Amino acid sequence: MKIGRYTSGLHRGLLIALAACSSLSTGSLTIQAQAQHASGGGTYFVAPGMRSEFQFNQAHVQCKVGHGVMPDGTVMQMFMASTSIDSVSIDSAAKTVTITGSMVSIVELRFTDGTTARLTETVPYTAFAKDNSASGGADFFSLTVVYTDTPGLDQFDLFGSPATFAGDLVTGNVVIK
């Protein structure tokens, strides 16, 4: 009988200790997740009349121009999406994030003579975002990519290298915690 009571008391104590430890463990994971968060989405203008849409989080970055007309009349569509994330640096005090990695950059062109071209390249990138909500200012997003110059028509010819697509947000927001 004494052994039975001792054993059940031991089980009760062990359960209480396990419950206490698990709540401590869960608590610190929650705090860490809250302290390291960066995400955003919205639109900004990369050139007058040329709106860009972006989304990012700590696992993915993408940016696109759904429709744009270049100075020579060429119609352009662009889509860029990360294929890897190499680093994520969050500065919670400054409310900024810098994300680096590789992404695919695809540009569809329709020239004024009716011909078309599709340009595809995998490029290194650096995405940067700033959450300006505390100051009441517009949030900011930029995406810098490094294009390769090749003998034929390529994205280097269109945008140079490095090329930075950046602006204050017109819609959407950036959240850095």
Segments (PLM) and residue ranges:
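C-terminal segment of classical bacterial N-terminal signal peptides
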Residues: 21-32
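Edge beta-strand at a domain terminus
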Residues: 147-177
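Short edge-strand/loop segments of extracellular domains
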Residues: 131-133
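Extended soluble regions of mature proteins
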Residues: 136-139
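Predominantly extracellular/secreted and cell-surface proteins with exposed
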Residues: 44-129
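Bacterial N-terminal signal peptides that target proteins for export
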Residues: 2-17, 26
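Boundary/junction segments of secreted and surface-exposed precursor proteins
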Residues: 32-47
